[in-house]
Amino acid sequence: MKTVQIKDITVGGGKGLFVLAGPCVIEDYDRTLAIGKRAKEICQRLGVPYIFKASFDKANRSSFGSFRGPGLEEGLKMLASIKKELNVPVVSDIHSIEQIEPAAEVLDILQIPAFLCRQTDLVYGAAKTGKCVNVKKGQFMAPKDMENVLNKMKETGNENLMITERGFSFGYNNLVVDMRSFPIMRSFDYPVIFDATHSVQLPGGAGTKSSGNREFVPNLARAAVASGVDGLFFEVHDNPEEALSDGPNMLYLDQFEAVLRDLVAIDKIVKG
């Protein structure tokens, strides 16, 4: 398997787990930074490479009035400051080709949301920057179909590519994770990430917003790591009940270390 370079972090190629973690969306600077600091400290204690994540804009909220974040310009300023303060790589979603250039000036990983994974101009344009690109598999996509997404990006010559499993639509307002997707997608020779928190989301399950079952996050994450997944994606918060987006499927920061410690132990057994 190919390795991918993200600043001074090398991932894939049979190396140990790496983690992308942070709040769903930038709520305010101080709280977002504080969450990132705690997540970094936890990962450092466990010897896990850490990448900070937070969205500057949640463009696909269930309702018009839902909180979306600070937006592109202000959000990128905050992410640049957090990146400097924590001295870690940062990742965030991009939603349109117009966002690619300014986002690439700040972000170490350009992330393509699941709903947009088939948008050729977006995935090609992101890869063309030369930055690492992480594409989330659509909730409507077979694992094998993600090879086509990778091939679009490979046309640019960029090999710093990753793909993420985040669940598959199973009836209305429900997602399931097919564990076969991990060996299938890893056969494409690029690092594969498991989004452990969005995979327990119940899309639109609360009427004007999504719900979720965070109690299943540890179970699914353990199964994914046992299958040999390369990285893990978590949304974490000091108090998910107060979170302005995706609270029901986010992990409490107080739970994060215990969950991750188990996953590191499993990963060491699997990868020797």
Model-identified regions with their sequence ranges:
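Catalytic beta/alpha-barrel core
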Residues: 70-71, 85-96, 108-121, 132-143, ...
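Structured C-terminal cap/extension of enzyme domains
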Residues: 10, 223-272
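Active-site-adjacent loop and "lid" segments of alpha/beta metabolic enzymes
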Residues: 65-73, 109-116, 172-176, 200-225, ...
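Structural preference for beta-strand elements that scaffold enzyme active sites
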Residues: 16-20, 49-53, 89-91, 108-109, ...
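Glycine-rich, proline-tolerant flexible connector loops at the mouths of alpha/beta enzymes
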Residues: 23-32, 50-72, 237-246
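Alpha-helix-loop-beta-strand connector modules within alpha/beta enzyme cores
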Residues: 38-41, 45, 65-91, 126-132, ...
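N-terminal amphipathic alpha-helix/helix-capping segment at the start of soluble metabolic enzymes
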Residues: 1-19, 77, 268-272
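Catalytic alpha/beta core domains of metabolic enzymes, predominantly
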Residues: 129-130, 134-236
